[in-house]
Amino acid sequence: MRQIAFYGKGGIGKSTTSQNTLAGMAQAGNRIMIVGCDPKADSTRLILNCKAQVTVLHLAAERGAVEDLELSDVLLTGFENIKCVESGGPEPGVGCAGRGIITSINFLEEEGAYEDLDFVSYDVLGDVVCGGFAMPIREGKAQEIYIVTSGEMMAMYAANNIARGILKYAHTGGVRLGGLICNSRNVNKEIELIEELAERLNTQMIHFVPRSKQVQEAELRRQTVIQYSPEHPQAQEYRDLGDKIVNNTKLTIPTPIDNDELEELLINYGLLGSEEEYKKVMEADMAAQALTRGAK
């Protein structure tokens, strides 16, 4: 069994990309379980064709404790027999969102949910790789990380930040970077830009996912493109990405770059963001550094 994880900046299309890709992998005969590790709990809705799955933390709070739950309470089966679990998170401003991830994974392991699977996929928020969100990496659960990014400044900044988190645990937990997935935003020279970023991070751009209205049309019906329009070219893009993940042997220890090098890369491609966007990056960087200092 291989344990993979999809990380990416909020709003980059990480959950949509992962669900479409995993749907294609399941259709090819792989036995898959998705563990949603994003407080939005939107990691499984396209597989289950529903609004949002009830989370482990929500049910545990209702029942009194996670020990009072049965596996059947939190594990649902969706498209192509993909098993689905959402860990959930606390109310905004209260507690650590990583608590739900830790609680869920421990519960699933104890209840035997990981048996008879080819892939377990963790769908993880990745704006800041704090201790909780880094848990699948830190505890050696996820062995292959795929970062969903685009040619936009904030998405690339987040990808580099995630690479830093992977590097931190690469030597102790054995986690590796499997590649960057470029979820296109139709930015100028986007393929070349992400290929160069991947090279600097000591990885590969494993696939370029073109932008398509078909994705939104499928989402309106709470479906993946694989389910909604299996013959559409966009469905084949996700199948191709899934095949590349299945056959991927280029698993590396990343070499994150500093902010000056990232800025230089954006300038070289004529894509440096506005002053407002630059301020956001600096604020996010200071917040990330404060979190790192607080964790020591």
From Swiss-Prot:
It catalyses: N2 + 8 reduced [2Fe-2S]-[ferredoxin] + 16 ATP + 16 H2O = H2 + 8 oxidized [2Fe-2S]-[ferredoxin] + 2 NH4(+) + 16 ADP + 16 phosphate + 6 H(+). One of its GO terms (molecular function) is 4 iron, 4 sulfur cluster binding. Keywords: 4Fe-4S, ADP-ribosylation, ATP-binding, Iron, Iron-sulfur, Metal-binding, Nitrogen fixation, Nucleotide-binding, Oxidoreductase. Its cofactor is [4Fe-4S] cluster. ATP binds at G8, K9, G10, G11, I12, G13, K14, S15. GO terms for biological process: nitrogen fixation. It holds the Pfam family Fer4_NifH. The reversible ADP-ribosylation of Arg-99 inactivates the nitrogenase reductase and regulates nitrogenase activity. The modification ADP-ribosylarginine is found at R99. The keyword Ribonucleoprotein does not apply. Binds 1 [4Fe-4S] cluster per dimer. The keyword 4Fe-4S applies. Signal peptide: none annotated. [4Fe-4S] cluster binds at C96, C130. Its EC number is 1.18.6.1. Belongs to the NifH/BchL/ChlL family. Homodimer. The key enzymatic reactions in nitrogen fixation are catalyzed by the nitrogenase complex, which has 2 components: the iron protein and the molybdenum-iron protein. NCBIfam families: nifH. This is Nitrogenase iron protein. It comes from Rippkaea orientalis (strain PCC 8801 / RF-1) (Cyanothece sp. (strain PCC 8801)). The lineage of its organism: Bacteria, Bacillati, Cyanobacteriota, Cyanophyceae, Oscillatoriophycideae. The gene is nifH.
